[in-house]
């Protein structure tokens, strides 16, 4: 059935989700197709997306735990069934969902006897537990048990050297990889000059985001990687004589805007990336951390939205306003700008 639907479309390149299911709170599955592709293109797209999905998607996890006066991670605590090492391994498996950046504090403070699960973690408002039933420890006696935790959003594997900290804190080898697995396959169809390829992409996630969200983020990361090449191609390239280094020209927002003004259809705000706004590194990094990638993303935010961004200051707001006021048409600012 899928083959018949795809084979009928031989002109426009299209993505389509053909299957989506939730196997458990910590296992989401999605199956997508992209077609029609010329011979060889499916492999190119499949390899790039698979690597981006597995290595470029950010996740939130617990990176450190502090127990108090515990001599080493192989110690046992009176009244607790698990050793410190087993508790650390259980904390490592906790799946969190958030859009935070930087390090945040969390804690567990309960009184036994009882089972401790992920539901007992006291989290910042911006962090959510995917599966509250995940086990942490079993208190077998009426004792007070408290753990201080650190939470961080990152990507890939984060390992730290094991040290005996005098304050009783221990690092956790965090795995900030929301995408569990990615498979892709290629199906060829058609005859002669009409032959083309269909890319099938399967994505499994840990529940902190859906396969569709993961695919969108991976695609956006790939686009950001290739933006410098697009700028160089549009503006031309320059080589300095008697030197072995290549210097791409600065692609400014004003030049881009001038070209867009010539377009009778108007200014496609979703095609102007914040990389082109001549912002300071600090302001640019704040916006990127908040998933603001294009001018359309920026203009859809209110002043309150921006000030809620981690490390965003009033000076950054003024810098953004001055930049937009300098380059954008006044009528566009009145219609679109909400801060």
Swiss-Prot record:
It catalyses: RNA(n) + a ribonucleoside 5'-triphosphate = RNA(n+1) + diphosphate. InterPro entries: DNA-dir_RNA_pol_insert, DNA-dir_RNA_pol_RpoA/D/Rpb3, DNA-dir_RpoA, RBP11-like, RNAP_asu_C, RNApol_insert_sf. The gene is rpoA. GO terms for molecular function: DNA binding; DNA-directed RNA polymerase activity; protein dimerization activity. In plastids the minimal PEP RNA polymerase catalytic core is composed of four subunits: alpha, beta, beta', and beta''. When a (nuclear-encoded) sigma factor is associated with the core the holoenzyme is formed, which can initiate transcription. The keyword Signal does not apply. HAMAP family: RNApol_bact_RpoA. This is DNA-directed RNA polymerase subunit alpha. Belongs to the RNA polymerase alpha chain family. It comes from Australopyrum velutinum (Mountain wheat-grass). DNA-dependent RNA polymerase catalyzes the transcription of DNA into RNA using the four ribonucleoside triphosphates as substrates. The N-terminal domain is essential for RNAP assembly and basal transcription, whereas the C-terminal domain is involved in interaction with transcriptional regulators and with upstream promoter elements. CDD domains: RNAP_alpha_NTD (cd06928). Residues 264-339 are annotated as: Alpha C-terminal domain (alpha-CTD). Residues 1-233 are annotated as: Alpha N-terminal domain (alpha-NTD). It is found in: Plastid, Chloroplast.
């Amino acid at each position: 059935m899928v083959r018949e639907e795809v084979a009928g479309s031989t002109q426009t390149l299209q993505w389509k989700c053909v299957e989506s299911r939730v196997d458990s709170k910590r296992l989401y599955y999605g199956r997508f197709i992209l077609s029609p592709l010329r011979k060889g293109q499916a492999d190119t797209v499949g390899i790039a997306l698979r690597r981006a999905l597995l290595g470029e998607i950010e996740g939130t996890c617990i990176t450190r735990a502090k127990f108090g006066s515990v001599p080493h991670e192989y110690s046992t605590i009176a009244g607790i069934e698990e050793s410190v090492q087993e508790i650390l391994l259980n904390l490592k498996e906790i799946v969190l969902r958030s859009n935070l950046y930087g390090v945040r504090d969390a804690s567990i403070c309960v009184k036994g006897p009882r089972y401790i699960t992920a539901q007992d973690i006291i989290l910042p408002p911006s962090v959510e537990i995917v599966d509250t039933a995940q086990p942490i420890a079993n208190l077998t006696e009426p004792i007070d048990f408290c753990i201080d935790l650190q939470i961080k959003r990152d990507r890939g594997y984060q390992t730290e050297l094991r040290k005996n900290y005098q304050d009783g804190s221990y690092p956790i080898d965090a795995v900030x990889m929301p995408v569990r697995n990615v498979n892709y396959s290629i199906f060829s169809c058609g005859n002669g000059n009409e032959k083309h390829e269909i890319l099938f992409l399967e994505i499994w996630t840990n529940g902190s985001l859906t396969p569709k969200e993961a695919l969108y983020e991976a695609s956006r990361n790939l686009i950001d990687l290739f933006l410098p090449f697009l700028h160089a191609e549009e503006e031309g390239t320059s080589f300095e004589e008697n030197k072995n280094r290549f210097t791409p020209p600065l692609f400014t927002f004003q030049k881009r805007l001038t070209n867009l003004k010539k377009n009778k259809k108007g200014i496609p705000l979703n095609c102007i990336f914040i990389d082109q706004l001549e912002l300071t590194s600090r302001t640019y990094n704040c916006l990127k951390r908040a998933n603001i990638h294009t001018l359309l993303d920026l203009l859809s935010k209110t002043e309150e939205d921006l000030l809620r961004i981690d490390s965003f200051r009033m000076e950054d707001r003024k810098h953004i306003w001055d930049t937009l006021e300098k380059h954008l048409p006044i009528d566009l600012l009145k219609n679109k700008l909400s801060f």
